[in-house]
Amino acid sequence: MNKFNVYAAWSTLCVSLVFPSVSKAGQYTNFDVSIYIPVGVVQSFENPQKLADDWARISRQLKVDKVYVEVQRNRQEANDQLLEQVKKFFLAHGVKVAGGMAASDGSIGGQFKTFCYTDPKDREFIKSAAELAARHFDELIQDDFFFNTTKYDSDIAAKGDKSWTQFRLDLMDDVAENCIIKPAKAINPKIKLVIKFPNWYEHFQGLGYDLDKEPKLFDGIYTGTETRDPEITDQNLQQYESYQIIRYFDNIAPGRNGGGWVDTYSIRYIDRYAEQLWDTVFAKAPEMMLFEWSAMLRPIRAGERTNWADLRTSFDYNQMVSAWSANAPAGLEPSVARVAGYSLEQVDSFLGQLGRPIGIASYKPYQSTGEDFLHNYFGNMGIPIDLHPEFPTNADLILLTECAKFDPDLVAKIKSQLAAGKSVVITSGLLRALQGKGIEDIVEARYTGRKILARRYLSSFGAGNGTVIGDEQASDVLFPEIDFLTNDSWALVRALAEGRGYPLLIMNRYSKGILYIWTIPDNFNDLYRLPVEVASALKNYVMRGFPVRMDGPAQVALFAYDNHSFIVESYLPVATDVRISVAGGKAKLRNLVTGEILTGQPDNAGGRGGMDDEPRMRFNAHLLPHSYAAFAGEP
């Protein structure tokens, strides 16, 4: 059985990851890199020497293909002469130039405030800003403030009997068309208009972001992949979202998702910034946008990384600084731009060997909510997710969370999948939402509303004794209770509370297919507290037939591709061991960075109840903190 340390993946890169020379665009093989320049920074370029000095410092550390020059933010506008001056500078340096604007109107104590789009003066201001951009640029991106928060008297009167969600959807569709698109194209018919959607996609519709109509109104979309710190921020976004949201938006606007956008905010250690960049391009984003120019010039703060500071992790801080010091002019310290450059140069060396991203098909209808962001917790458990805005009928197995309830025809679609011999996994939240709406015609299981606190677990398949799995000293987890009919449904994984078993995964045969019900903890973070053996028992069914699988602790993600390549990435602050299982006759794994060949052993894990009989090979991996490894399967 082979074992390796992830730091070996970077040993051959150390020589090449050194201080880059000042250069023109087109330096990356698998993606472009761009920087967004807010209007306040643009105005500082009234002094042309500052622009030249900034560019000299940034371009020494980072290969830049494109910049986005902002024309307006918080009612602060750049003038025509300055915009032309800045544009000409970058074009002269071989850098592509686009415009940007932010429809923000300041804040109230840090709480975002938008324009009031029922106020004719605000509408006219936004229109004039779009026209300003159109006079100077052939592309314009809307920063992620293109939503509405105001509930002024004029808004209340215009809303009438509509819900706030419907009112704001209609309002922002109108603003997009009549205050941005038509005015800009009247000035510059060839301008490409792009809307950047932020990271809080579960709640878009409530503030007027329309994932259904706006991608059709605009020429392109862009994706906010900034997940920052999952604990200290108010959003608590999970790391996997930096990858998953790109894939979801790719499925919304195939071929028109321009890239991912990451900032430097709310991180406790510098590795977290690198992880957001990596995960964005692991999803095959064509462009990596860095927000923003002045942040690239700030000193690097390594942060709270003492536990792994001396390890050869994927973001090898010491190696980065050492390589810089050996090549940089005396006294010139690296800035955040070098962190971005170092991180992106690493992954650019192997991304071209990865195929098309794949995952477990899942479904989030337009304008839906329910079990918000749960898909990203699945991703952090090592379950790759491929999220779609339309029901993915071609998938052999579909994983449905509560948000799918917004499809009025959902039960009929589930029946069709099962009748076709396919499998459907629904969460306990979706079961609760579908009670009384037809789910009983498939399975008579019930979300009771009662709760159980458990720390012991069993697995089984048919009648008889179950097998104890996991550490009996595991943490307590609070689950909802699901009732089912004995012998109609079967509990595959159970939680034990004071000697009584409660189902965590139920299977029910319907027509030619199988319906599974997955009981989700009240606190999604408790998914990470499940013993490894319990998570593995769940994956036996949820990932049935998937070509690659990773078993190990939570907060280790798996990114899979359609050419038998994959990446495993740990977000943990400690080293960890994982087991990898691959199908498709792949007896070896080739490290895509070092070329090392790993030879596997037959995977006789069993425990799948005869549900997954395809031969598989297993490999062991040792991952250092906040590190990843990339592989391709070979015969």
Model-found features: residue ranges?
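Active-site-adjacent "subsite" loops/lids of carbohydrate-active enzymes
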Residues: 28-53, 81-138, 148-152, 178
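The substrate-binding groove and active-site-proximal loops of carbohydrate-active enzymes
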Residues: 37-45, 68-77, 109-127, 160-174, ...
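Short, acidic/polar
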Residues: 43-61, 119-133, 203-214, 269-280
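Catalytic domains of carbohydrate-active enzymes, especially glycoside hydrolases
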Residues: 50-74, 132-141, 221, 277-291, ...
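Active-site groove signature of glycoside hydrolases
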Residues: 61-73, 125-166
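Aromatic-lined substrate-binding rim segments of carbohydrate-active enzymes
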Residues: 71-106, 159-187, 405
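Hydrophobic targeting/anchoring helices
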Residues: 110, 138, 144, 149, ...
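A conserved amphipathic helix/loop scaffold
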Residues: 375-376, 402, 406-635
